[in-house]
């Protein structure tokens, strides 16, 4: 193992000089051990990742934790390999940081467990496999209009505060309990409070026993936020490749991965690209996304929350992510303003799986009719705003009336939001979702007030609500 010395510290960027030309390779992990002020840990260990070889036997590195206490002249040891993290069943029920160290309060992992490098090649073309099996989520708007594929990549797009994290938590609740397989959750640059809440919720429900959690949250330096997604992915890949499992990978939030990459890029002195992003944006995204795939021995189904800065979908960060996805669930602020939750835009959300060959003729026909009706309602809204409902033809009045019921019926109570809403969450199987909307489109429930359709699960709940309102059903 070659040794070097710290010659410069600039925030999370540390320059290290090695003697005798024994330079570490790009992505190698370097370690600094130094005395700490903290009483409980008299020595601290800082891991650095090599980013650039500058010449004159100097490498520029990115720190994976705070560089407080690091000084020029300190000894640096080259570990000879990239960062490695624990893999296998030992990771289930545990919470890790970017380096694979446990950050929950349980016993530390034994030192002799298997560890894999976080930088790996994507599976080769002949190892890839595609499936056309639908993954049922129990969320009506998703299952009906933008269904998810097993082994697919799904993006949850939305601006600040429209419900991405709540939706991803509901998907974890529904799929992890119904699917019963192994899940990996990577918290990338999001709020520590949300990660803490999620951990205790999963502990209470028992789902944690089949879940590995990895966090690099908002308070971490950019190096940790940039690499923590790879840590989570490495754990998921092992279950896919070695244990031949179908794995669920949840990432909240992919935008923070890009944002951390942008910070690192600026710190390394690269020329910024469009809107100040790193020039390597597409490459970094591709390296991550190409590894999240299904092979002929196992699958990874990934559900990724993607923050949309200022609700602008043309921003390079969300726009680059779009190209890699099989299904998109778009959350819209205008729907939250109407009190429709989940605030999924039924016209903007898309899925490769919405075809008669995959979902079946009946499901496809009902979904396209729902979209046609909502599109017609959208076109008529300007006329209604200017002239009012009275100027519409009888056919258009009926379309508007049904479209409003459909729009409200696409809303639903979530299990993870019970403490906020005071109403029980609901899981609706796909068959019941299709049947409910088919009857609604046929005019079977035209006599039921619109408010009865708000925030309910199955169509039977609508009828019960209508009875409570004093309406004959």
UniProtKB/Swiss-Prot annotation:
It is an enzyme of class 7 (translocase). Pfam families: ATP-synt_ab, ATP-synt_ab_N, ATP-synt_VA_C. It is found in: Cell membrane. It is a peripheral membrane protein. SMART domains: AAA. Its EC number is 7.1.2.2. GO terms for molecular function: ATP binding; ATP hydrolysis activity; proton-transporting ATP synthase activity, rotational mechanism. Its main location: membrane. One of its GO terms (cellular component) is proton-transporting ATP synthase complex. It comes from the Bacteria. Keywords: ATP synthesis, ATP-binding, Cell membrane, CF(1), Hydrogen ion transport, Ion transport, Membrane, Nucleotide-binding, Translocase, Transport. SUPFAM superfamilies: C-terminal domain of alpha and beta subunits of F1 ATP synthase, N-terminal domain of alpha and beta subunits of F1 ATP synthase, P-loop containing nucleoside triphosphate hydrolases. ATP binds at residues 158-165. It catalyses: ATP + H2O + 4 H(+)(in) = ADP + phosphate + 5 H(+)(out). Produces ATP from ADP in the presence of a proton gradient across the membrane. The catalytic sites are hosted primarily by the beta subunits. Belongs to the ATPase alpha/beta chains family. HAMAP family: ATP_synth_beta_bact. F-type ATPases have 2 components, CF(1) - the catalytic core - and CF(0) - the membrane proton channel. CF(1) has five subunits: alpha(3), beta(3), gamma(1), delta(1), epsilon(1). CF(0) has three main subunits: a(1), b(2) and c(9-12). The alpha and beta chains form an alternating ring which encloses part of the gamma chain. CF(1) is attached to CF(0) by a central stalk formed by the gamma and epsilon chains, while a peripheral stalk is formed by the delta and b chains. This is ATP synthase subunit beta 2. It comes from Listeria welshimeri serovar 6b (strain ATCC 35897 / DSM 20650 / CCUG 15529 / CIP 8149 / NCTC 11857 / SLCC 5334 / V8). The gene is atpD2.
